[in-house]
């Protein structure tokens, strides 16, 4: 029988179950004290409860969750905490404040049906994503939440923004859980993982679900193999003797702002690649357009084709049927016998991609997805193998290096800063290093032998960050936000105290 805290978001009356002891607990205690004091000062009342959700680092399995494939992230200690209270006694407003002065208070109507103004990007929009998504889901479950009421909300997030560590998912997940808890509900974690993934689509990002699933389902001491359809998490104990170091390239990745040319562009390219593979492998164009959504949908056909050639590798079909040269819109429309906007259901997010794109690299995107999916299972199989910990760590590092090459060359989601940072990590003792998160900026993750972590961090700081400190790109006193080691940390929680 599964424990309740494995099924539902746990509710705690103290911080220790999540933050442990020592310096992490001291830091958390200070943050909660500041949140309570600031909440009282801003809103003239105390919060009813708190919710928190962590950021994450993806160890391997990049850009494949939205294609239906398993991924392998772990939660990090950096999180977003939200203090919240219902306001039955005031105008029906959502007042969303932040402990960081950089983010001014946002005010919205307490209306679950309101549209989000995507042309006017505000940090508070992420809370409205959660607000809308929660109400839609509660309604679909037949939960009566009564008439809309105002909410006072104070946010404290320490996941670096634009870092590839899922600051947006940590915010949306903690917001959804805070709203859920203040309305007296507690949905199952697997439901919340799906719900919060849908929430982020309100802000125009076609999220695959990994970031939300790990933020909600993580357990202290374990990475998680996250599977989709249905969402489930399998605990993975990493080999002894290794540690993960996370390093920010200092190039910020604004996923929601650049989506049409970067993140959402790749989603569309993968969809088009999968439909063309379906057609080339025997489906009628109309059938493929209506039934094929992801590359995992046509993997069976690709494997069957490979089987006829003495293999089980879906990449054979990619090599045979998708040309390496970029496709034009006209070439794709000729193969599929339909216009691209119609193929993509005239979806506004996809139309924005079509307006921004001049060509589509279908071969490269499909090759990345199928090879990266295989690497995830290679990572899992290595962890479960009978090899020595030292050999396991070497193999895991090799897989991380292969993953970065694929992300950089086939998926083209790296940037010059990430390339430099990954090389610095490898040149100075990392067993493996790769970009993590959506890419186009953000962080790299390096696998390092535990006994060498302190020296590794000092060397990377000297070789990559010192010149950037001198140029004023980053402050010396903020370095621990941008370069740190992390153990697998705890997932989402509710606090009542």
Residue ranges and their predicted role:
Residues 1-56, 60, 81, 85-120, ...:
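C-terminal nucleotide
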Residues 70-89, 218:
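Structural signature of FAD isoalloxazine-binding scaffolds in flavoprotein oxidoreductases
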Residues 75-78, 165-185, 448-449:
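DPxDG-like acidic metal-binding loop motif
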Residues 131-132, 136-159:
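Glycine- and acidic-rich phosphate- and metal-coordinating loops
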Residues 137-148, 179-195, 450-463, 467-472:
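Phosphate-handling active-site elements
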Residues 186-233, 307, 433-436, 485-487:
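Alpha/beta catalytic cores of group-transfer enzymes, especially the acyltransferase/condensing modules
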């Amino acid at each position: 029988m599964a424990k309740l805290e494995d099924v539902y978001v746990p509710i705690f009356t103290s911080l220790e179950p999540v933050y442990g002891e020592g310096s992490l607990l001291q830091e958390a205690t200070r943050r909660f004290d500041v949140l309570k004091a600031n909440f009282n000062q801003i809103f003239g009342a105390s919060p009813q409860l708190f919710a928190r959700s962590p950021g994450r680092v993806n160890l391997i399995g990049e850009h494949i969750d939205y294609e239906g494939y398993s991924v392998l992230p772990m939660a990090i200690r950096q999180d977003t905490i939200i203090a919240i209270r219902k306001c039955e006694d005031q105008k029906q407003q959502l007042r969303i404040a932040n402990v960081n002065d950089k983010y001014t208070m946002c005010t919205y109507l307490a209306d679950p049906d309101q549209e989000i103004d995507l042309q006017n990007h505000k940090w508070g929009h992420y809370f409205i994503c959660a607000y809308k998504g929660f109400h839609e889901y509660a309604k679909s479950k037949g939960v009566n939440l009564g008439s809309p009421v105002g909410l006072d909300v104070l946010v404290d997030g320490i996941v670096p923004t634009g870092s590839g560590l899922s600051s947006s998912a940590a915010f949306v997940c903690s917001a959804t859980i805070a709203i859920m808890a203040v309305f007296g509900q507690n949905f199952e974690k697997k439901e919340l993982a799906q719900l919060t993934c849908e929430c982020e689509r309100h802000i125009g990002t076609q999220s695959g679900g990994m970031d939300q699933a790990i933020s909600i389902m993580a357990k202290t001491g374990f990475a998680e193999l996250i599977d989709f359809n249905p969402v489930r998490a399998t605990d993975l104990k990493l080999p002894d003797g290794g540690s993960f170091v996370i390093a920010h390239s200092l190039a910020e990745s604004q996923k929601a702002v650049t989506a049409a040319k970067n993140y959402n562009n790749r989603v569309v390219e993968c969809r088009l690649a999968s439909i063309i593979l379906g057609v080339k492998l025997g489906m009628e164009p109309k059938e493929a357009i209506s039934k094929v959504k992801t590359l995992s949908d046509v993997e069976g056909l690709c494997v069957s084709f490979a089987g006829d050639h003495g293999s089980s590798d879906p990449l054979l079909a990619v090599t045979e049927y998708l040309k390496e040269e970029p496709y034009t819109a006209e070439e794709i429309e000729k193969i599929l016998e339909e216009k691209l906007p119609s193929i993509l259901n005239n979806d506004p997010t996809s139309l924005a991609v079509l307006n921004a794109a001049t060509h589509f690299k279908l071969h490269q995107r499909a090759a990345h997805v199928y090879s990266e999916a295989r690497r995830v299972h290679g990572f899992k199989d290595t962890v479960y193998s009978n090899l020595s910990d030292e050999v396991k760590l070497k193999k895991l590092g090799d897989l991380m290096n292969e993953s970065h090459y694929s992300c950089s060359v086939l998926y083209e989601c790296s940037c010059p800063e990430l390339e430099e940072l990954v090389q610095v990590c490898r040149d100075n003792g990392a067993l493996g290093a790769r970009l993590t998160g959506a890419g186009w900026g953000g962080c790299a993750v390096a696998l390092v032998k535990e006994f060498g972590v302190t020296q590794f961090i000092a060397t990377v700081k000297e070789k990559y960050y010192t010149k950037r400190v001198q140029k004023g790109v980053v402050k010396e006193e903020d370095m621990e936000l941008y370069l740190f080691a992390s153990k697998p940390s705890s997932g989402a929680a509710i606090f009542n105290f």
